[in-house]
């Protein structure tokens, strides 16, 4: 083998020489040049199968450059001049592209030609997604009620919803679309707008992350599954892997009964009825998987517009609120809807289990959660109201004198439903400051007319301002009193001099209050109201002295204080003088507010006798004790009572029989009338709900608890199928109850068709109080215990009114020291029974009325045998070994 052949075999595929020159950056890339190059090229050149992965055959030796063909060197150095020029050229092209997009102005940087209005510019994803969502909602409303076969996930494909072309072909030719069709679509309006107008000055709320799935089998009947931005993530949705949980039959019935129907019955909430009518279809499409998803959909989509134009284009929320219809016309209507919805949500919490209420990672429904939700709703309503009131279309352009200034607000491009919007041109927001930049916290700043205004304070932003410190850095400026109050006093420190001297005299006071009182004797701030009086300038140290002076000297009708001892006629203008008179002349006990020691030597002559104690009605009934209140039965359990003169028997206790006692709750509830049909059921009155009282109950209750319902609600009959609540009465077709589509929920399923395990799961996870069934009802699904006493571990005894749980000492695990007190060698045979199994509990209960069964079930270890049947072995029966009867 030659040396040249060995050298060629060691050639790396990525190290092979470059046959053609690199394309020039400034060269023309027109189609004509490409065609010319292809036509002028050699026809012998062809693409071989292994050209990409294998080293080509070596070129002729005449064409090899000895420098470029040196195998140990790369083709081009990273610091090559041509590489640097290519990088600089790319950066220059990017600068040229960005210079054409001015995001802060609506004025075009260069005139647009006709070719710029074509399809070369991609449609913004937000606009395209809103258009797709509107078509999806239109298909939902217009979907036929007939059942359609649910396609398997293998036949479902993703619809191409990207704004740009993939390059692999097109589904619709532009020549096939007429000009009239283009003028009706939303793309005709969007392509007339500037790119910076679309991206910078348009506020769009869309369902981010929504994906559409379309079946290939039928062009008319399509099945769409969407993801909402409120209840789902933005990640891609896989129909096979991530199937969101669907609400079950009981949860859908409760939501329809407690949330959908009450809102649809409210005439004042009529603007929000389209949103509520879309809830059943959202549940079917798995957009709503729990009560928390329903809450977010109702509360956060309430101010969003869903108006359908005549061309079928869905409108976009928040940005066209003055042109199109919105759910919330005002802040008051939105708050009214949210308050009513929150009360319905609070009611439905008691009728749904934890799995249907929220996800495991979500915050549970408590009083604190509802209070936070109310505060968040009101703050959100205030933000929406503020944004709508401060829209550019609501404000007039600024004018300077008689001549208007430069147009601050400009009109959008000539589209009729965009023409009413004025967009602010010169306002933009930036993030200024930072601890690493100027030592101040970062904050948002609005640039408006060359002025910077802080959004945090609303004042002009000063970029070079000195950052404020919490404490002064100068030690000399700190007050001594501040140091003493902020620092803890040292141990064994000498006492501080707290004596303060008066500034006007030489008196020293230990207390600051005494010093303040003394200083008023020098300032005398209380002046007389009479200008001619000398005390008008001198004044009095206290207000009381000033009032007494005016009453004595200047009052025309002074208040006189008369002596209370008749027939004495003494009177004085001063109350203190009258009291001193009664004390000296009549021996009255003058109790002064401040004891000065003058009355301590003499005793009181006219002491007031003590009032004799008078017995109150409650003091005579102290010996009567309050009787103990027994346990009350459940309201849904029939009223029971013991029969008079029951027969005495330990083994056969008296059973309860029905009596004519009054019921605890009325049977005719205003919300329990099911005879007229479920469609007439009105769980929420329109005038009796006071949200302020509801909020007060939440604030006064435990934040981690949940206040009970204020009125009773009756559930559906568990044995009858669910009727159609919405299709005929409410008047919309997208209810899962009325839907006969196989892809929707099966609402014709009755309780009897569910598995027993599912029934127990639904009942054990409920937060509401369980209803006590009657003894005559067979509990085949919930009765998991056996009533056969022959089994070693019998079930608990029937419910009694007293505690009767008896067990042997060896039936539980005890401590090591305590176990020494019992006989370890004793082996008990069986535990004795205190009460007999007489009450019938379903099919598995034991009939204790037969004599033969009593004798068969009799245990030799039983403490008290039955007295109703003769037992020959009764006299010879021995007592149990674990009992010692000392006194019988």
UniProtKB/Swiss-Prot annotation:
Region entry Disordered, spans: 1-78, 132-176, 388-407, 589-663
Mutagenesis or variant effect for residue 518 to A: Impairs DNA-binding and leads to itraconazole hypersusceptibility
Transmembrane segments: none
GO cellular component: nucleus
Biased composition annotated in UniProt, kind: Polar residues: 23-32, 167-176, 388-397, 602-632
GO molecular function: zinc ion binding
Domain of life: Eukaryota
Subcellular locations according to the entry: Nucleus
Keywords for the protein's UniProt record, in alphabetical order: Metal-binding, Nucleus, Repeat, Transcription, Transcription regulation, Zinc, Zinc-finger
Annotated knockout phenotype: Leads to multidrug sensitivity to azoles such as itraconazole, but also to terbinafine and simvastatin.
UniProt induction comment: Expression is increased by itraconazole treatment.
Zinc fingers typed C2H2-type, residue spans: 500-522, 561-586
Domain notes per entry: The C2H2 DNA-binding domain and the C terminus (residues 596 to 888) are essential for the functions in itraconazole resistance.
Function: Transcription factor that contributes to azole resistance by coregulating the expression of the drug target erg11A and the drug efflux pump mdr1. Binds to the 5'-AGGCA-3' motif in the promoters of ergosterol biosynthesis and drug pump genes to regulate their expression. Is able to interact with the promoters of sltA, sltB, erg11A, erg13A, erg24A, mdr1, abcE and mfsC. Involved in antifungal drug resistance to azoles, terbinafine, and simvastatin but not amphotericin B or caspofungin.
The protein, known as: C2H2 zinc finger transcription factor sltA
Organism listed in the record: Aspergillus fumigatus (strain CBS 144.89 / FGSC A1163 / CEA10)
Lineage start: Eukaryota, Fungi, Dikarya, Ascomycota, Pezizomycotina
Gene symbol of the encoding locus: sltA
